Design a protein with these regions (language model features):
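Acidic (Asp/Glu)-rich catalytic clusters
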Residues: 8, 74-81, 121-125, 154, ...
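Short, acidic/polar
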Residues: 32-47, 108-124, 170-173
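Surface-exposed, active-site-proximal loop segments in enzymatic domains
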Residues: 94-107, 228-232
Length: 314
């Protein structure tokens, strides 16, 4: 698989990333059986063997079990640890943490950032995280406090680079003003059924500041690939059907699957979007890599955009 630089760093990552949110098959740690953990390890190995060199996780994915699965994979596969880059995230706290009446919330306090990083390093069984994200915007974020936490992690050798996830441009600009080094990534939801980043300045900022945009849920939870949620009683049935029909037409022109075309559509943008593949199916993981060799024409790209909008361009 081809590679690209992560932001303005010298670090190179694969053009598609592997995300392990679903790797253990549950969000409840008590349900992670040895069989599920083994299946998760096999999924990571399948991605590595298919050419993925950037692996994405988060502290909240099954309360750290997904990070543990990646860590176990690194132990099993000789040379993998040095051949890949590892990203994980902090900042989301679910309801009940730490007290029964504690609400679901976001926490960018220095205390939580530092604690979460140490916990992730333990789960992953590594010494340094290549890319450490703030997961979702904390409206109480104090940039100087975050900067101090980042500096402490950097100085301790625990984190190589920092990024953000689900941040609008204004949040990125505000935080960046207080940091000693540039943010290198912004991971947001991007796919033909969610066009906001194309219009709200997110991708423009990525180009301007040389920030790598990574797309989580690039297939809209899978339905852009399978069409499984295309039901006649859905309020956007006609729009979705037109979109899938258009994608199918382009896929037919290439002799490729709908999934590959959707990924190639994202990768066409000059901001160099990196789609994050979250399948546990080795065949699907391998199939997605075909998008790296597809260069849609401008006409094909715009046909999909117009169908995604559900109305003609002005």
């Amino acid at each position: 698989m081809k590679t690209q630089h992560l932001g303005e760093t010298k670090v190179k990552i694969s053009r598609l990333a592997y995300g392990n949110m679903r790797s253990v098959g549950t969000w409840k740690p008590a349900e992670v059986t040895p069989e599920k953990m083994e299946a998760a390890i096999e999924s990571h190995i399948a991605a590595y063997e298919a050419g993925y060199t950037h692996f994405d996780s988060a502290d909240i994915y099954c309360a750290g079990q997904c990070e543990i699965a990646l860590g176990k994979t690194l132990k099993r596969v000789k040379g993998m640890k040095k051949a890949i880059t590892i990203a994980t995230k902090c900042g989301i706290r679910f309801g009940g943490d730490p007290n029964p009446d504690s609400p679901h919330r976001y926490d960018f306090s220095a205390e939580h950032i530092l604690w979460s990083c140490d916990n992730s390093l333990k789960n992953l069984d590594i010494e340094r995280i290549d890319l450490y994200y703030l997961h979702r915007p904390d409206l109480l974020m104090n940039p100087p406090e975050i900067a101090k936490a980042f500096n402490k992690l950097k100085k301790a050798g625990k984190v190589k680079h920092f990024g953000v996830s689900n941040f609008l441009p204004s949040f990125v600009t505000t935080l960046q003003a207080f940091l000693d080094e540039p943010l290198v990534a912004n991971q947001v939801e991007i796919h033909p059924a969610r066009l906001d980043p194309y219009y709200d300045g997110t991708l423009d900022q990525c180009i301007e500041k040389n920030i790598t945009p990574l797309a989580w849920s690039p297939l809209a939870g899978g339905w852009l690939g399978t069409g499984r949620e295309l039901k006649a009683d859905h309020p956007e049935f006609e729009k979705r059907k037109k979109l899938l029909d258009t994608i199918d037409a382009v896929a037919g022109e290439w002799g490729l699957s709908r999934t590959v075309i959707v990924l190639a559509w994202l990768m066409k943008h000059p901001s160099k979007i990196v789609p994050i593949i979250g399948s546990n199916n080795p065949a699907n993981i391998k199939e997605a890599v075909k998008a790296d060799d597809v260069e849609l024409t401008r006409e094909q790209w715009y046909r999909i955009l117009v169908a995604a909008r559900g109305k003609p361009l002005p």
